Amino acid sequence: VSAPLPAYRSLVEQAIRSGHVHLVDLELLSGDDMVRETVELAHRHQVSVILSNHDFAATPKEEEILRRLHHMEDLGADIAKIAVMPQSAGDVLTLLSATHKASQSLSCPLITMSMKGTGLISRLSGEVFGSCLTFGSAGGASAPGQIDVGELRGILETIHRNL
């Protein structure tokens, strides 16, 4: 959501209080106080929370990715999610390594992905490294590197048959 923070917070809180949602996705960089308060509100209403961090410019160092994921868990995330923008194939390996390490140390599930074409392999093989979910598009991609859900399903079925 690209809305000013007060409008974003109000929208998320209305969704939580509506009784019609089971899961909300909050941006980590909304600020610790806002995130903590919103997570508490969500949990009081039996709504689960994905805490997300989207880096559309670069891929942070592995230690920073791990720090962010652990911070999400510390703030009460039910699921921790990070999406990064690779500048090289090495950046994709950095994300996958961080995913594997985080899956061993976090108590909550995590979702990770490296964006654009370079990062596609992370969307297809993320679960091998510890990511619990991937995203496909139905119509048009909503993020760089998403592929059609039909294609994705076929690729994942092939991977699953051979694991």
Residue ranges and their predicted role:
Residues 1-33:
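Glycine/small-residue-rich loop that forms an oxyanion/phosphate-binding "nest" at active or ligand-binding sites
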Residues 13, 28-163:
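Catalytic alpha/beta core domains of metabolic enzymes, predominantly
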